[in-house]
Amino acid sequence: MIMKNGIVYFVGAGPGDPGLLTIKGKQALKEADVILYDRLANPKLLEFASPDCQFIYCGKLPNRHFMKQKEINALLVEKALNGLTVVRLKGGDPSVFGRVGEEADALHEHGIRYEMVPGITSGIAAPLYAGIPVTHRDFASSFAMITAHDKSLKGTPNLDWEGLARSVQTLVFYMGVKNLSYICQQLISYGKSPSVPVIVIQWGTWGRQRSVKGTLENIQQKVQEHQITNPAIIVIGDIVNFQTHSWFESKPLIGRHLMVVTHGEDEDPLADKLRDSGADLIEWPKWRTENMPVNEEILRKIGTFEDVFFTSRRAVCEFFRALASQKIDIRQLTAKLSAASEQAKTELEKRGFLVTAIQPDSEKRLVVGSRHAVENMQKHESCSFYITHENVIDDRFTHMIQRTISESPLHMVICPNKLSVQQLINGGEQIGILPEPSASRPPIVCIGDDSAAGIYGFTAVQEQDELLAFIHNQHAEKKLLHT
């Protein structure tokens, strides 16, 4: 049997904000058998992939490549020749200083199909998130996107400096912090005024975005003072003075690197609230769901229960899917329905059910939920139980979370409930966070677990609003001290 070649999708991951991924890029990630991803692709995008998809890290740091370009080319060819659907996930747009041409050439030589999926490039997005458009009818009718490196041993770009200095109104340099002094000197030498404004934007569109403004004459000194490093975008031109409001960097939690600990059941909307406030957020651990076999014995006597209690939204969905698979008339379900979470309650209401208050334990009660939730309740209750699924930690994400924390240390770890507190205590060592107090451990804040707070030195709060106020106050104090 002759195996049919697969296909490779070169997908632009966008500049960092996961909401900037294109619809076509998202679809390619969903269909992928294997994803080769770069350092500057937000790991959250990998959550769109199927549970069986293989992740391969191809990250590159200045002067240190995790995987050489020839190895990446060979891996793309190998996976595609095995008949797999491959996504090459590249930061920004794959065609803007992304070496996509070399990788596409390797595929073409082997007769492998590929498609290009453009992405939003950081040279446009980062300035915009800093409040600066790259063009403006009064300030700039032209702009250029320029690499700040070349293939020479010196690594300084060999460019038409006179043409850039005289003819282009907005200059955008990629990854140029190392050569910033050289770039400024060249532009001044070829006619740019030393007072031309410059802004350097680090980690554009991420929650850790920072920027510093200056001129061609003094920007190097300011970058050193603020310890700005790559990845960064340099914008040069009068358009920089157009910045009137840095809408993104004015968000209340911008610059805060936070981790929310999850527990596998219905997750709290806290993570989205923090992300909307500008925080650079990690959710750990990542979970995948394994459905359990249908319990026909329980389903056959569904009409005998007086109360059915659902532990999560997933439990609701899987339970009613099981009923449908057994062709059981939903009208046999005459029990009162109750739920442990708002998400589960909403899912029941979407299906047309009225949700009652949680009922007391009885032999006529059925608890429906994940293996972990059911096993915890079996210790204390005498009712019947139906296990719909099992939540399992997705180890594919562990390495990338470790790497993210090592590159950008956490300012705070947040446990939204008692289950997440136990998850951190039992598994935090896996990502280098021990619950015991130490100089290297980030502050840990939890909701409603005073005992753990007392043992491990966590900060305990009682309500989510109190938690949000605590985080905002901590950030405000940090900014005040920095100022």
UniProtKB/Swiss-Prot annotation:
Keywords: Methyltransferase, Porphyrin biosynthesis, S-adenosyl-L-methionine, Transferase. It holds the Pfam family TP_methylase. Its EC number is 2.1.1.107. It comes from the Bacteria. The keyword rRNA processing does not apply. Gene3D superfamilies: 3.40.50.10090, Cobalt-precorrin-4 Transmethylase, Domain 1 (3.40.1010.10), Methyltransferase, Cobalt-precorrin-4 Transmethylase, Domain 2 (3.30.950.10). This is Uroporphyrinogen-III C-methyltransferase. It comes from Bacillus subtilis (strain 168). The gene is nasF.
